[in-house]
Amino acid sequence: MKTKEINELTTAEMLDKEKSYKDELFNLRFQLATGQLENTARLKQVRKNIARLKTALRQQELNK
C-alpha cells in the first residue's frame, strides 16, 4: 500500500486497515513458525504497511 493511497483514506478506514494488517501479521507469524510460509517477504511488507498507517494516523492527529 502506497503512502498516497493511505492519505486518501479516512481515519476509520485507516484503523480498519491497521487491524486487518495486524491480523494478517499474526497469521503469517504462525505460518512461519510451522514452516508453511512460502513468501517470507510478505512479513516485511505487512510490517511496513502497519508503520505507514500509524504514521499517517499520527500526522492527522497532529494536524487537528
UniProtKB/Swiss-Prot annotation:
Keywords: Ribonucleoprotein, Ribosomal protein. The keyword Ribonucleoprotein applies. CDD domains: Ribosomal_L29_HIP. InterPro entries: Ribosomal_protein_uL29, Ribosomal_uL29, Ribosomal_uL29_CS, Ribosomal_uL29_sf. GO terms for molecular function: structural constituent of ribosome. GO terms for biological process: translation. One of its GO terms (cellular component) is cytosolic large ribosomal subunit. The keyword Ribonucleoprotein applies. Belongs to the universal ribosomal protein uL29 family. HAMAP family: Ribosomal_uL29. This is Large ribosomal subunit protein uL29. It comes from Levilactobacillus brevis (strain ATCC 367 / BCRC 12310 / CIP 105137 / JCM 1170 / LMG 11437 / NCIMB 947 / NCTC 947).
